[in-house]
Amino acid sequence: MGDDQSLRSTVAENDISANLSFTQGFLLGQLSVVLLIGAFIKFFIFGEAPPPPSRGLSHRASTHRRSNSIYTINPNEGTSRSLREKPSTSNVLRPVPSSATNTRSILRKTYYSAIPTNPSGKHGRHRIHHSSHQPESLDWFNVLIAQTIAQYRQTAYLLKDDPTSSILSSLTAALNNPEKKPSFIDKIAVTDISLGEEFPIFSNCRIIAVDDPNSDGGRLQALLDVDLSDDNLSIAVETSLLLNYPKPCSAILPVALSISVVRFSGTLCISLVPASTPPLHTPSPSPSPPTADGAVNAGTHPTNGSREPTQEAPNAQEESPPKTSPKSNVAFSFLPDYRLDLSVRSLIGSRSRLQDVPKVAQLVEARVHSWFEERVVEPRVQVVGLPDLWPRMGRTGVRTGEDSETGSNAASRSAMSADMGNSLRADDIGREPDGLRFRGLGARPPFDSVSRTSSFNVETGGFRSHSMTREGSGGGMSDDFHMPGTLPGGAAAN
């Protein structure tokens, strides 16, 4: 009897201990899961973003070293070289000696001291020497840049409703490029754009010499400090993250982002580099102008139908720039010690939303910095071709408000030319000295109402001239002048 009671009490104690062990294990497991979830939310989602890596002078000195090589070149090596390696009878352009185009000669002739007199340091190593010349303030350059940026902002606002040329359509097309956008991101819609109100300030411009094996005597480079702060340059977009498993668009997570530039500062490097290869030429679908032989034949046998193409052919050749000559380029980049501070606002979710997640801001900032460094941070540079600055009639314009003054001057020149030209026409209308012929053409045909190239009317008060002609393609002026109200023919010669 006593043994049965002791056995029952032992079994009961074992059952109670087993139940307690299961309850304790269950509670401990639940508590560990809760702690893990809490730690993940606190340290991963709402944790503070690590500070950006330092871009101080130490990083710049270790990754960006320049060698001032213009003083290391032997002045006795190399003599003056002509523009062509082989002499040619058709080369009438005088050769330019290399000593007149290297960096040392440029600095001497422009009274700019860019390199100190002691370029070598200890142990024969070359140190980075900036200009001993006083840095430029660049106030005038800031005004020009501010005007250019203001014009771009105004133009972008005027074209805001244009479906093809607006900045909104351009950004939307760039952000939704199917070759670069991942498949788990839905269409990106731009909701807000601010082009800012402030302007970058450039200062402390100095010239340094950079070792360049492709240039005789090195290459000159301008360093400009730039700073942009307290501006509202921003862009806001909306998109959705797509979950394509187990089937496409299984879940959609709306995301809204706003990126603003808080401050940007750095050192801008600008240098001129020659073109490595001539630009490619795409043939124009328009008919080609007459050749020189055709022009000679047309000038030798003039007809009413062939006079206008004959006179317009040299003009077309003058207006069109050469297609095979290489152009100079300007290269610009930023030193690695730049500073780009961004402000990223985020809103994730549809009903219960997460606002300003630090991890999202960190990812966006890293992507923006990577995009910027892959394009304009040394050793990568942006190369832009210099525009053609040769004066051409196709680009000639008149400032607003000066039309009347220009017209009066042109009218007076027309009247003087008419008085002087008509007095000589009676005797010389049929003959012309050989030295006054158009270059590349045959004998100059007599002028009449058909052979005039182009004319424009100038109206100043009661005077109106219909015969003022601009300079022809061959360099001569049309001498078929007449005054309204005068007799036709040779009566004006009297």
UniProtKB/Swiss-Prot annotation:
Q: Where is this region: Disordered?
A: 53-99, 278-330, 395-494
Comment, domains: The SMP-LTD domain is a barrel-like domain that can bind various types of glycerophospholipids in its interior and mediate their transfer between two adjacent bilayers.
Give compartment(s): Endoplasmic reticulum membrane
Q: Which UniProt keywords apply?
A: Endoplasmic reticulum, Lipid transport, Lipid-binding, Membrane, Transmembrane, Transmembrane helix, Transport
Q: Which InterPro entries match?
A: Mmm1, MMM1_dom, SMP_LBD
Which cellular component terms (GO) are annotated to the entry?
A: endoplasmic reticulum membrane; ERMES complex
The UniProt regions of compositional bias labelled Basic and acidic residues, in chain numbering, are 425-437
The GO annotation for biological process reads: mitochondrial genome maintenance; mitochondrion-endoplasmic reticulum membrane tethering; phospholipid transport; protein insertion into mitochondrial outer membrane
Residue ranges annotated as Cytoplasmic topological domain: 47-494
Q: Which organism is it from?
A: Aspergillus oryzae (strain ATCC 42149 / RIB 40) (Yellow koji mold)
Can you tell me which family this protein belongs to? Answer: Belongs to the MMM1 family.
Membrane-spanning regions, if any? Answer: 26-46
Q: From start to end residue, where is composition biased (Polar residues)?
A: 68-81, 88-99, 300-318, 406-415
| Membrane topology according to the record | Single-pass type I membrane protein
PROSITE patterns referenced in this protein's UniProt entry, alphabetically: SMP (PS51847)
Record field: compositional bias (Pro residues): 278-290
Key word Protein transport present in the record?
no
Subunit structure, interactors included: Homodimer. Component of the ER-mitochondria encounter structure (ERMES) or MDM complex, composed of mmm1, mdm10, mdm12 and mdm34. A mmm1 homodimer associates with one molecule of mdm12 on each side in a pairwise head-to-tail manner, and the SMP-LTD domains of mmm1 and mdm12 generate a continuous hydrophobic tunnel for phospholipid trafficking.
Query: Hey, which stretches end up on the Lumenal side?
Result: 1-25
**What segments bear the compositional bias annotation Basic residues?**
57-67
Specify the protein name.
Maintenance of mitochondrial morphology protein 1
GO molecular-function terms, A-Z: lipid binding
